[in-house]
Amino acid sequence: MNLEELVLKYALANAVKYGGKADVKAVMSKIMAEVPELRPKAREVKSMVEAVVARVNSMSLEEQLRLLRERWPETLEERRVEQKRPGIENLAELPNVKGGVVVRFAPNPDFVLHLGSARPAILNYAYRLKYGGKFILRFEDTDPRTKKPLVTSEINAYETIREDLKWLGIKWDEEYIQSMRMEIYYEHIKKLLEKGAAYVDLCRPEEWRKLRNAGRACPHREQSPEENLELWDRMLEGRFKEGEAVVRIKTDLSHPDPSVRDWVAFRIIDTSKTPHPLVGDKYIVWPTYNFAVSIDDHLMGITHVLRAQEHSVNTIKQSYIFKHFGWEQPVTIHFGRLKIEGASLSKSKLKALGVRYDDISLPTLAGLRNRGILPEAIWELILTVGVKPSDSTIALSNLFALNRKRIEPIANRYMYVADPIKLVFKSDRELLAKIPLHPSFRERGERIYKFGPGTIELFVPRQDIKPGAVVRLMELANVEIIAVENGVAHGRLHSVGIDEARKVGAPIIQWVYEPIEIHVVKPVAVGKKVEEIGLGESALEKVETGAYVQFMRYGFLKKVGPSAFVYVHD
């Protein structure tokens, strides 16, 4: 392959990846990485790259794709072998699979991903792993007014979504951002206007609703292509204000669902007032969800669409675009909503809570990650629910159970007292406690405590201390509580063995000796958490940040800093 062909290959690949426009710097980087000996001739190479990129950018996206498929199909094919995940083999078979699938996950970056949005991401990627093919990440961000992409000094939803997907172990083959593809949408609506499959509607919204509900045509429906193209140009020039003109797709005016009748494909959004975070006020005429999705699904070669049941009407609307262009529509599988018992997955409600998107009390993926939920647990949950047309309601306890079985073997045991009281008692003998780091993995070691004979001072849970009662100090001894005076509990050694404790029904309680102060942050409800300060074993100082532990008789936690822990679940 000569140099010009190599440049053409990378220019086409870059253009297809980014909506039809190649970038000189990106192509140069690819060339220099593959042929480093060309670096001394970078100036001459750049001139060639600029010329080829200009030629490629003058082509339509369809032409770019055709050339790439004809000459370098390997750039569009599966490029890596990935490990199958447990549970994928149990997924229901997809219809009409021909040697692989091309699927997409298409989030709106107006908020971060949560447990509900993890479902389409995981299911689509799981089928990509099951059959081979391609997984596309597509940001659907063409509504800068009502669903404005979330980009602030604190959060960039585009980046956060990418991070969440990487955390889930999802690797996308291609990425697209719809707001960067506006010229492509303009090109295609112009074709529909030319062939009389769409028209510019100047009716007032209330007038249109009356006509639509009556199944009658708008007076602008019969405009000639020339008239529509002129009105379209006026829309692009800013000659109309918001709400004064829209472009409609011709459908069936007698369709039983009024929303399907001549739905809006383009509308005017005054981006001088609500600028888009990526393209600012460059565009004022924006495609609706259904139009942009239809064009992209075709151009990106999507074979199967897996999405929520709530999109079933959108599938019908999009079918008209495919019919007008004579394209084959992807196979669409709808699944029910995923509901979390006692927790809302509504973006608006989560935003309204007023806490950071990655707060451990939220069911966002960032929040669950910070809380200590493992991505493998989320995968198992989603694959277990699978692709069902009916809604599924699960409790967070289901997710916690799946997470627990993964962290239980790696979480060493430690003692912690949330609301401590000092316990003082005397022993006439030496007491010995051997506490293993993990009862199932004795080889990890143990802590050995020796006390007495004499006065012994420990800290125990206040709620377990009642005068006259006997308590079993875990792995140590049985103590009878005599009195509580001035905030200190006093007792006497009752016995040592576990059998004696059972005979008197003594509860087993944790205790700490020469403790350190421990800070625990605990989620108590969606958007709410509490912080408690307790006492823990000094051995907790040696636990690495990020490690999981189990506080006995308390729950599983994740260390997030010196003496700081996050409560994961019980």
UniProtKB/Swiss-Prot annotation:
Q: Where is this motif: 'HIGH' region?
A: 107-117
| Predominant location category | cytoplasm
UniProt-annotated location(s): Cytoplasm
Identify a single GO molecular function assigned to this protein. ATP binding
Which terms does the UniProt entry file under GO BP?
amide biosynthetic process; glutamyl-tRNA aminoacylation
Q: Does the keyword Aminoacyl-tRNA synthetase apply?
A: yes
- Establish whether keyword Ligase is in the entry: yes
| Alphabetical list of InterPro entries matching this protein | Gln/Glu-tRNA_Ligase, Glu-tRNA-synth_arc/euk, Glu/Gln-tRNA-synth, Glu/Gln-tRNA-synth_Ib_cat-dom, Glu/Gln-tRNA-synth_Ib_codon-bd, Rbsml_bL25/Gln-tRNA_synth_N, Ribosomal_bL25/Gln-tRNA_synth, Rossmann-like_a/b/a_fold
Reactions catalysed, as given in the entry: tRNA(Glu) + L-glutamate + ATP = L-glutamyl-tRNA(Glu) + AMP + diphosphate
PANTHER family per the UniProt record, alphabetical: GLUTAMATE--TRNA LIGASE, GLUTAMINE-TRNA LIGASE
What is the role of this chain? Catalyzes the attachment of glutamate to tRNA(Glu) in a two-step reaction: glutamate is first activated by ATP to form Glu-AMP and then transferred to the acceptor end of tRNA(Glu).
> What's this protein's name?
Glutamate--tRNA ligase
